[in-house]
Amino acid sequence: MSKDEIIDILDLIIESIHLVQERFSRIRVPDDFVLAQEGVTLLDAISMRLQVIGESVKRIEKTDLSLLQRYADIEWDKIARFRDLVSHHYEHVDHEIVYDICETHIPKLREVIQKMRTAISESYEL
């Protein structure tokens, strides 16, 4: 995979994170996802963007696993597994887990993805 292709994937992840954070800003507690139709709609929309993030991570993993290994503080395998859950067993998606992902893990992921993109843009050669 070329440097430009990886940057495009990272840009897609950054865009998805932005949308997740924008949508999640309307959620105060986990049950906000299930107590009203708007919350259910937000849960669906956020879950789909988490799926996009997971699919993008899997694409990088297939072609340049060493890139992900350089940023070992992110649990890349869990991101990929959550993508699989959303894709193949959506009925088992737990709103409390989605809340935790958005509240706890997405801000750190955004920071790391932006660092990766900067590093690749400046010096990374495949």
Model-derived segments and their meaning:
Residues 1-126:
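Solvent-exposed interaction patches of small proteins and small membrane subunits
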